[in-house]
Amino acid sequence: MADLNKLAEDIVGLTLLEAQELKTILKDKYGIEPAAGGAVMMAGPAAGAAAPAEEEKTEFDVVLTDAGANKINVIKEVRAITGLGLKEAKDLVEAGGKVKEAVAKADAEAMKKKLEEAGAKVELK
C-alpha cells in the first residue's frame, strides 16, 4: 500500500511537461487513452473544480434568518409551506433556521418571495 501512496504522490507532483510525457508513454506503449479532461487535469487545484459545482446547484435550503416585525404573517406562511402545526411553526419562526430543505430552485425562490412579503428575511443556501 505504501508503494501506491508513493506513486500517487509522484503523479500529483509532476510538472505539466512531465505529465504530458507520461500521457504520451501511456498512449504509445500501453494503448491507454486519457478520459475526457484527462488524468493530467485531475492534478489541478481543487478550487477550480469546486466553482462549476456551485453553478450547477439545483437544490436549495430555504433558511429563515429573521422573522421581522410581523411574526404572525410569517408564521402563517411557514405553516402553509411546511404543513407544520401552529406551535411548531411559531417555534421555527422564533428560532430561525431551515424552513425547507433540498427544494428546487424555482420553488425555493417562490417560498423566499412569499416569506419576504410576509416580512421575514430569508436566505437560499
Curated annotation (Swiss-Prot):
Alphabetical keyword list: Ribonucleoprotein, Ribosomal protein
GO cellular component: cytosolic large ribosomal subunit
BP-aspect Gene Ontology terms: translation
Any one GO molecular-function label of the UniProt entry: structural constituent of ribosome
Pfam families (UniProt xref): Ribosomal_L12, Ribosomal_L12_N
CDD domains: Ribosomal_L7_L12
Gene3D superfamilies (UniProt xref): 3.30.1390.10, Single helix bin (1.20.5.710)
Subunit comment: Homodimer. Part of the ribosomal stalk of the 50S ribosomal subunit. Forms a multimeric L10(L12)X complex, where L10 forms an elongated spine to which 2 to 4 L12 dimers bind in a sequential fashion. Binds GTP-bound translation factors.
HAMAP family referenced in this protein's UniProt entry, alphabetically: Ribosomal_bL12 (MF_00368)
Entry function: Forms part of the ribosomal stalk which helps the ribosome interact with GTP-bound translation factors. Is thus essential for accurate translation.
NCBIfam families linked to this entry: L12 (TIGR00855)
Similarity comment: family membership: Belongs to the bacterial ribosomal protein bL12 family.
Name by which UniProt lists this protein: Large ribosomal subunit protein bL12
